[in-house]
Amino acid sequence: MEFKLKHKDGMARVCEITTAHSTFLTPVFMPVGTVGAVKSLDANDMKNELDAKIILANTYHMYLRPTSKVVKDFGGLHGFTKFDRSFLTDSGGFQAFSLSKNSKHFNEGIEFKSHIDGSRHLFTPKSVLDTQYDFNSDIMMILDDLVALPATKERVKISVDRTILWAKEAITYHKSMQNKGIGIGQNIFGIIQGGTDYKERKRCALSLNEMPFDGLAIGGLSVGEENALMYETVQNLNPYLDENRPRYLMGVGTPEDLVENVERGVDMFDCVMPTRNARNGTFFTSFGKFNIKKAEFINDHEAIDPACSCYTCCNFSRGYLNHLFKAKELTFFRLASLHNLHYYLELARKMREAILNNSFTQFKRNFYHLRGK
């Protein structure tokens, strides 16, 4: 992976990242294709309608079904999905933690029950990389020990100890596999844990900074803490993160979260929020969000956002989308998802532009002003 820090405005950054399959600028939002597809959209939508340069797929889900062997037989995720740009795959640790009621965390890994058939599985630092080698993803995430917040100091310390242990095991294994010709062209990111405990976050960040990861992620946030505490945690981490590697805030979040964390030096984001909200009838716009199912939109001839240039806004009215949603027409999910993802990707583009123009502070002021804040 090639990484270039192109410009800074305060702590906000524009970086250029080149993988084996695409080049993209940050700040970047990565649409989430949990099972190898962004819900209701295909590779053509992602490339031609949205021009997404990188998307995320989920190791836990793809490991269980269709299995990594099947994906490998198709030539990895790119051959399987026909999305020929960059893929980031997470380690599956979060899903093993959140979807399995009886998951157990040991120093060896995470034992969990499949949410599909109840079968038992073990994720280890090595096994999740083996799965991602089969996927041939451009960016692989290591296994980390996530804790739900609030958590005791003792549990947070165990999480950091275990995450550092697994990080060492993962990076050593990855380098040894590359020496054998496996994982060439694949990049590996470490994940910083520590909850909202300043000392533990710092300890984890400093330890992972010493390891030759291609990038660093901030995990374990947006899991129950207040937004202000999340922002403070990210800001406090900034001095301890290597400037010459990408910074990825996992699973975050709202448009406001993106703006606030870009201001605090984050480069990469992913979240299911735009597509999940789309399926529930909620649209993100330059003036905030609203739900299309309200009766006031039945005869509304306006686009979802008159300032938006997405396929949905250029072709269809709020009244039509109100009708599709109430009729439970499947077409609605595609049109709504196209709009919401376009909004997120366009927000990232506007932030890049503002940073390059040294006007991010003014951009943020205008962003909130349009929302009446």
From Swiss-Prot:
<dbReference type="GO" id="GO:0008616">
    <property type="term" value="P:queuosine biosynthetic process"/>
</dbReference>
<comment type="pathway">
    <text>tRNA modification; tRNA-queuosine biosynthesis.</text>
</comment>
<feature type="region of interest" description="RNA binding">
    <location>
        <begin position="251"/>
        <end position="257"/>
    </location>
</feature>
<feature type="binding site">
    <location>
        <position position="310"/>
    </location>
    <ligand>
        <name>Zn(2+)</name>
    </ligand>
</feature>
<comment type="function">
    <text>Catalyzes the base-exchange of a guanine (G) residue with the queuine precursor 7-aminomethyl-7-deazaguanine (PreQ1) at position 34 (anticodon wobble position) in tRNAs with GU(N) anticodons (tRNA-Asp, -Asn, -His and -Tyr). Catalysis occurs through a double-displacement mechanism. The nucleophile active site attacks the C1' of nucleotide 34 to detach the guanine base from the RNA, forming a covalent enzyme-RNA intermediate. The proton acceptor active site deprotonates the incoming PreQ1, allowing a nucleophilic attack on the C1' of the ribose to form the product.</text>
</comment>
<comment type="subunit">
    <text>Homodimer. Within each dimer, one monomer is responsible for RNA recognition and catalysis, while the other monomer binds to the replacement base PreQ1.</text>
</comment>
<feature type="active site" description="Proton acceptor">
    <location>
        <position position="90"/>
    </location>
</feature>
<feature type="binding site">
    <location>
        <position position="220"/>
    </location>
    <ligand>
        <name>substrate</name>
    </ligand>
</feature>
<feature type="region of interest" description="RNA binding; important for wobble base 34 recognition">
    <location>
        <begin position="275"/>
        <end position="279"/>
    </location>
</feature>
<dbReference type="GO" id="GO:0046872">
    <property type="term" value="F:metal ion binding"/>
</dbReference>
<dbReference type="GO" id="GO:0008479">
    <property type="term" value="F:tRNA-guanosine(34) queuine transglycosylase activity"/>
</dbReference>
<feature type="binding site">
    <location>
        <position position="313"/>
    </location>
    <ligand>
        <name>Zn(2+)</name>
    </ligand>
</feature>
<comment type="similarity">
    <text>Belongs to the queuine tRNA-ribosyltransferase family.</text>
</comment>
<dbReference type="InterPro" id="IPR036511">
    <property type="entry name" value="TGT-like_sf"/>
</dbReference>
<keyword id="KW-0862">Zinc</keyword>
<keyword id="KW-0808">Transferase</keyword>
<dbReference type="Pfam" id="PF01702">
    <property type="entry name" value="TGT"/>
</dbReference>
<keyword id="KW-0671">Queuosine biosynthesis</keyword>
<feature type="binding site">
    <location>
        <position position="308"/>
    </location>
    <ligand>
        <name>Zn(2+)</name>
    </ligand>
</feature>
<keyword id="KW-0479">Metal-binding</keyword>
<protein>
    <recommendedName>
        <fullName>Queuine tRNA-ribosyltransferase</fullName>
        <ecNumber>2.4.2.29</ecNumber>
    </recommendedName>
</protein>
<feature type="binding site">
    <location>
        <begin position="90"/>
        <end position="94"/>
    </location>
    <ligand>
        <name>substrate</name>
    </ligand>
</feature>
<feature type="binding site">
    <location>
        <position position="339"/>
    </location>
    <ligand>
        <name>Zn(2+)</name>
    </ligand>
</feature>
<feature type="binding site">
    <location>
        <position position="193"/>
    </location>
    <ligand>
        <name>substrate</name>
    </ligand>
</feature>
<dbReference type="GO" id="GO:0101030">
    <property type="term" value="P:tRNA-guanine transglycosylation"/>
</dbReference>
<dbReference type="GO" id="GO:0005829">
    <property type="term" value="C:cytosol"/>
</dbReference>
<keyword id="KW-0819">tRNA processing</keyword>
<dbReference type="InterPro" id="IPR002616">
    <property type="entry name" value="tRNA_ribo_trans-like"/>
</dbReference>
<dbReference type="InterPro" id="IPR004803">
    <property type="entry name" value="TGT"/>
</dbReference>
<feature type="active site" description="Nucleophile">
    <location>
        <position position="270"/>
    </location>
</feature>
<feature type="binding site">
    <location>
        <position position="144"/>
    </location>
    <ligand>
        <name>substrate</name>
    </ligand>
</feature>
<keyword id="KW-0328">Glycosyltransferase</keyword>
